[in-house]
Amino acid sequence: MIQFSSDRQLKFRKYWLIYAVFATMLAADVFAQSSYSREDIKPIDRIVAVVNEEVITQQEINEVLQNTVQQLQRQNTQLPRMEILEKQLLERLILKRIQLQRAKEIGLTVSDNDLDQTLRRIIQDNHLTMDEFRQVLLQEGTDMNRFREEIRGEILMSRLKEQEVNSRVNVTENEIDNFLQNQANSPAGNEEYRIAHILVQISEQMDEAQIEARHKRAETAYESLRQGADFVRVSAEFSDAPDAMQGGELGWRPLGQLGSPFTEMLVNMQPGEVTPVVRSPVGFHILKLLERRQQEQKVTIIEQTHAQHILIKVSELVSEEDAHQLINQLMERIHNGADFMDVAKAHSEDASASAGGDLGWVSPGDTVPEFEQAMNALLPGQVSPPVRTPFGWHLIKVIERRSQDVSERQQREAARHTIHARKADAIVQEWLQQLRDQAYVEYKVEDN
């Protein structure tokens, strides 16, 4: 139905909350306390790399480097050597630039309205006013316009990944059945693992000597960990994963999302232990188990609403005023005795029109907030006044309500998400490497 919100929108909301918390934690004075002074960063702007037809400058690296040092300092992490850190960050800037170029190439955009909504969620979720948020940005040495463009780029890369990776991943009902059966039969089936990882990436274009060199790099990282080196520092120095500068933290993951051979290793590990180097199609991995816990099996009862609605869209042909006037006329007809279903069939512009506007049983979160709030305010049999949502003007009628046990449905949805994430994880690094291999990248070496 056109008024339903998407899972993707919900995922964005969670992602930007994490992004905002990370951004607001950075303190401007930490860098001054670092063992690296501002003088350690090259002050002269110059071109350091050409990516297709665009350039990356020293100034761009300096800005990312400063924030990264701040973050590592906050984690009390011993910093890698400056030249190593700078090289790692340059590779990340190159990959980011390639993704943004690809998004532009296939026509992906982020509207100002989408951007404004995301920024409002960031500010609200962090319990800040707009003025307070601007002050935080100023303390970080940036401003709202620059922050907006950073967020626009992150949304574009998320949409690119959604279109080119996630949308191609299919999960069947049979896979869900098998997953749940295996989970029920496994002693560790209900466990979750908080893990961090290091990835030394390989690609199909590499010959045996190059792959062996990458293997030795991974083994060097593993040996550093065995000697007691901090995992966050080793991740920053050796890992090719996008989250390397955050210590490779992957958060909490159910066992079924990790896949073989990692599952066999993790079930026998204790928090703080690391795996030896493990090879996969995309590279060499090292995992660290941070914590483990049992997933709670909860009974979930929700209130569902059986509802109908009528939608009049606002478009180039129908102005806001005309749409509002028409929805008011339809409301008057219903108040004067016209059947809601007949009016919906004749006038609604939603896909549900042929069913008399019947939406079936609607669960919390299924619809956009404006629609849900208006629907929840109605008693069975009542019709709402006109309601404006991003899709247009609505009339909503509540038919009945019920309490529903959705535990099994949620369990299946959780299994679907876990399987989808595992499949996506298996191909996203390969996809990123393919983008990198197909791009023209030229490094500009500074003359001595």
UniProtKB/Swiss-Prot annotation:
Biological-process GO terms, alphabetical: Gram-negative-bacterium-type cell outer membrane assembly; protein folding; protein stabilization
Keyword Transport tagged: no
A Pfam short name: Rotamase
The keyword Repeat appears for this protein: yes
Enzyme Commission number(s): 5.2.1.8
Location(s) in or outside the cell: Periplasm
Official protein name in the record: Chaperone SurA
Domain PpiC: 190-291, 302-400
InterPro entries: OMP_Chaperone_SurA, PPIase_dom_sf, PPIase_PpiC, PPIase_SurA, SurA_N, Trigger_fact/SurA_dom_sf
Protein function: Chaperone involved in the correct folding and assembly of outer membrane proteins. Recognizes specific patterns of aromatic residues and the orientation of their side chains, which are found more frequently in integral outer membrane proteins. May act in both early periplasmic and late outer membrane-associated steps of protein maturation.
Organism of provenance: Nitrosomonas europaea (strain ATCC 19718 / CIP 103999 / KCTC 2705 / NBRC 14298)
